[in-house]
Structure formats: structure tokens, C-alpha cells
Amino acid sequence: SQYTGQSFYQYIEKGGYPFITISVNPNSAWSADYNDEGLEFLANKLKAAAITYKDKPIFVFSHSPSKRTPWGAKWGYDKMDKILKEYPQVIHFTGHTHYTIEDERSIWQNEYTWINVGPSHYANISTDITPDYEYPDSGKKITEAVIVDIEENTDIKVNRLDTYNEKELKTPWLIKAPHNGSQFKYFGDMQTRTDKDASPVMNGTPQVTDITEYGCNITFNQGEDDSFIWHYKVEAIDTRTQEIKYTRLVLSDFYWRNGTPETLSCPVSGLTPDTEYKISIKGVDSFFSESQPVESTTFKTNALPPVDPSVKAPKADLVDIVFTNTEAQNVAASGLAVTKKGTGTPIGYNTDLKMYVIKPNTTGSISNYYMVDYKGNTTYTNGVKNGFTYEVYCKTSDIKTMQYPLSNLQSAGMGFTFNETYTDPKGATFSAMIRGDGKYHKLNFMKATDVKANTYYHLLFTWNGEQICLYLDGEFVASDVCKKLTMPSGDAQYICIGADSNSSPSSAAQNAFKGEVAIARVYSKAVNASEVASLYKQLTTRSTIAEFTTLNSLLTSGSLSQELATEGWALMNNIATSKEELDAFITKVNSK
């Protein structure tokens, strides 16, 4: 108000009609919501205007829309709507979203009329279609306005203008008298509105190029519509099962109007190697009407290179947790320490795996677990920023509860989850999650129907700066494109073994794991398929070496000298220790 000389809240009577302006909370630098003073002013002036100007529209102007609007509700608020809905004669004009008025969702009538007035400086694109926020910058070339005419019979005509190109947009909106809600035209769901137009029409055959093991690129012709196509639904279909294996939405670029491109291209990802697919594309308009699909010719993704059995298993250089009968240690070269929170978790020797494991068992605990705090450790943060591998060997005794065996997923980061209930795809199964591209990527290791309680699974996922790959028990199972990694900040920079991290190590952890964890590792590179196979082979080979159990008896008997105990624990904690090395050590002990 100090710049305009105007008050924050105004009631204006002009030409025989009432006008009310409400500013957002003047005491908040960031919120676009309304304060109690403004809402009280609105309620009082609406009540007075409804009496003084009976049977006439009441014009209300404010910055932010309601959460109930069909276009930009994400940026809306609830408080004003509760007042306006008592007055069907209200016509509420708002901005805030920067969404185009060319879209018919910019007018909506329910208990009152709402109108989005469009962008005056630059345009935004709905994040319903671009959740990664990678929509193009409008470059100040999409600017709009409305001119409102009041007819002699009090009908309201709203003329839509493209102010950058100095021309009208589409046909005007008409709000007919009487203004008591009986003449609402733009009401209900978009699919059932009376102004709904015909469905889009697609043509041409989509072209598939740049085929890889996990995806391809697709180019297709833009479709046709009475108004415009809002977006396209791109689906990759497995031709053998007819299952949809991948779906993405692609914005049509309609907002460029005369400069809209004739063709669009997009990547398709998350496909299975050596599998036949076809691509199906449908056009979708603002009323959510879908066209008939156009389909590509079938194509086959590339096969993975054969696993090389001569490739050695890599060593985890950032985090490599091993357990003794009393503690957890990080034997990776990074030097990051493992910290026991509370009492940690019970540790015991697993006679099937032939190694020590932590045993959260059937209850788990958000107070007792192990953690690796990497805040301020550039070896770790630089190590994962361009690519990494997360690895865990675990089993759960509870195949219903949400739980995390190895995780750093507080607001960002990556980790393993089981039955995580907030993010699609949902289901009682093990998943890998990575925060990147403005969203959580979540990929399942197996179907929920395939998960067995008290069964060990070797779970591993990699990210190479562009692609996430999942491996289950040494074999590839799934992939997805991820171009940008988002890591936790501040005190949330720590990894939990047996739970998920929180905002700070001083807070209780989250979603305690209910089962056992034998291996917890992080690498500063994306290991390849041959290395994954070798890592899993190490585990299965170890489980067949009975001499580890003999070694454990010697280590826990208390009969070994300090020198022999140190040597023995080094053998126990090395996943690659061979039967021959154990035989030699046992012979050495027995000869003393």
C-alpha cells in the first residue's frame, strides 16, 4: 500500500455494481493465503452488497484461487472459498498460477463463479503433466488479460486476450443472468461440462529410435482437437502379455499457439532388456477426453551383455558394515564410523548364512539401531553425487508392515523400503527409492505375491547419473531414468541400518525393520551386472562353507590368544574368505 496509496482491502461501488478487492496476508513474505482481517472484511462486505445490489453480480478480486478449482488447485487456499460459496452471484477473479486462460478450466462455476485471469508477465505449465518441473520457460511471450463487459440485461461477457500477440483468444465466456446459480454453464467435472467439445484425433505412426536395454526414444505427430490437445499419454506395452509397462505424460506445447511444433519427442524408460514392446499414444484435451490411440511398430529392447564369471566382486568403498558378536564396524576405505543408537540391535551368528547379522527380529525399534553420519564428509557426498550402488542382504519376519532395512530417505536421498505406503507403486514388497528429478523414483524388486517371510534377499540398486537399475539375487529386474539426484541436507545426512533416517540423529528413527540384516553397503560407483552376480555368488558360496561355524565356536570360546582372535575375526569379517583359508587357520589353532 505504501507504493500504490491503496488499502489492502477495498469496497468500491461504481456504475451501479459492487467491487471487492482482497490482498493476501500483508504480514507474510512468502504465503499467498489470506489473513483473518481480510476474510472478515470480505464476509462483511459481501453481506452488505448482497442486500444493496440484489439480483446483481458481485465482483471479487484477489491473488490466489480456491483449492477446489479445476485448474491450479495446487496453488490454492481454502479459507476464502468457505465465504464465497454462500453467494452464487459472486464472480471471483484470481491470478497466482500463471496458467493460460486459453484452457477452459480457467472458468469454473459451483456455488459461485471463478475465473483465472492468466499470466501478465510469464506463464507456468501445470505440474500435473510435468512433475519434475522441467517445463519450458515461456520467455515472457505468453501474456494474457480479460476484458469484462456487463450487458444491459446484466449478462457478463468475459473476453480473453493474448496481449503479447494482440489478438483475442477463442470465444468469450458468458455468465448469464439471473445471478442466482440457476444459469451456471461451467459447472461440474470437466468430463461432464455442457461446454465440452469433441475428443482429440491422432494420426501417423509413432517412430521408435535409439533403442537400448532399458528404453528408447519416441517421436510422434501432434494430434488435432476442436480447441487444443493438453497432453499426450505415452504407454509402452509388452506385446507378449499386453501389460502396460511404462506410462508418461507429455505436454503438447499448446501454449505456443501458432508456434506449436508439429511433432514431439520423448524418452521411454524402465523397460526390460530383450523384450518386445509397442508404443501407444493418446491425445488428451482439457476436458480429459482421450483420442483413439496410435501405435508404433513393434520393437525389441537390446539384451544385456552376458555376465562374465571371471569378473571379481568389487569392494564397497563408502560403507561396508560387518558385524561381530558385540559390535558393528564399517570396514570401507572412507573411514566413516558406525554409531550405535540406544542399545543398537541384537547381533547373532546366522548358521545358514555363516555370518553375523543384526536381528531387529519381530518388533524392530526406532530407538535402537545403527547409523552412519556423513554430514560434512565430502568423501561420501562427492562419492555418490555422480553415481552409486546401494546393497543390502536381509530378510523380514513381517510381510505387512512398512519398514526400512537400510535407508537415508528423510525428505530426499535413497534407500530400501518394504511396503512403503506413500508413493506409487504401492504394495507389500521390497522397493528401491531415490529422490531425483523433483520426485521420488520408486521401483519394486518383486511382486508382493512373491515375497516370503523369513527369506533372505540380496537387494541391490545402482544409479549411474542417468539410469537406476535394480538387481534381485544377482539378476537384473527393473530400471528407470533419473537425471538428477537430490540428497538430504543439514542434520538429515545420515544412513540408518535397521530403520529409516529422520530430520536429525537426535530424533527417533522411522519405520524400524523387522527381521535381519547381514550386509549393508554403499559404493561410489554404479557396479555392473557381472559385478552384481559376483557379489551374490560370494554370499551363496559362503553359506556352503561349514568351517565358518567351526571358526565361530573358536572365536566365542574365549580360548584364543589375542593374536589368534584378531586373525580369526579378520577371517570372519571378510566376505571373501575361502574354505582353504579357514582350514589353515583351524589347523593352526589346533596345533597350539
Language-model-detected regions and their locations in the chain:
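Localized edge beta-strand/strand-to-loop motifs within extracellular or lumenal beta-rich domains
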Residues: 150-153, 455-469
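Short, aromatic/His-centered strand-loop micro-motif at the edge of beta-sheets
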Residues: 433-458
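Binuclear metal-dependent phosphoesterase catalytic core
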Residues: 101-201
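Flexible glycan-contacting loops in extracellular carbohydrate-active proteins
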Residues: 480-516
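Extended recognition patches within non-cytosolic domains
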Residues: 307-316, 516-557, 563-564, 571
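Extended active-site neighborhood of metal-dependent phosphoesterases/phosphodiesterases
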Residues: 1-43, 47, 53, 79-89, ...
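Extracytoplasmic low-complexity segments
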Residues: 302-365, 533-549
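Extracellular glycan-recognition modules
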Residues: 314-318, 325-330, 364-431, 467-468, ...
